[in-house]
A protein has these predicted regions:
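C-terminal terminal-subdomain/extension
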Residues: 1, 64-113
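Short, charged beta-turn/beta-strand-edge "cap" motif at the junction between a beta-strand
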Residues: 14-18
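Compact nucleic-acid interaction/catalytic patches
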Residues: 19-23, 28-60
Length: 113
């Protein structure tokens, strides 16, 4: 399956033991053509409901309805690659405001400017 950048998808965690996984949301960060098709993988960021966090980079998701989430959640810059075929389903997409904020956070934390 091909997923667009900033789609929210459901993936199995952890990836190391296929017999003991839980389904968790994640945000697709990679370009579907330049990275996804070429490598068969997607670069993603974790989505969490953890409100008490020591991660200063946690970004609240404002538009939870478009994202397909059922309650308050945060994008956590805990990044990982996952094979395309392990993605269970697409659940939604970040809203435009959330996309702008996430792009700014990535630029800030990875000194991309």
């Amino acid at each position: 399956m091909i997923f667009e950048r900033f789609d929210l998808v459901v993936v199995p965690f952890p990836f190391t033991d296929i017999h003991a996984t839980i389904k968790r949301p994640a945000v697709v960060l990679s370009d579907p053509i330049k990275f996804g098709l070429e490598t068969g993988q997607n670069l993603m960021a974790m989505v969490t409901r953890a409100q008490q966090s020591s991660w200063s980079s946690d970004l609240p998701i404002d538009d939870i309805e478009i994202a397909g989430l059922t309650g308050p959640s945060f994008v956590r810059l805990k990044l990982f690659n996952i094979e395309n075929q392990l993605v269970i389903r697409r659940m939604g997409r970040l809203g435009e405001s959330d996309i702008r904020q996430l792009k700014a956070r990535l630029i800030e934390h990875f000194s991309l400017n």
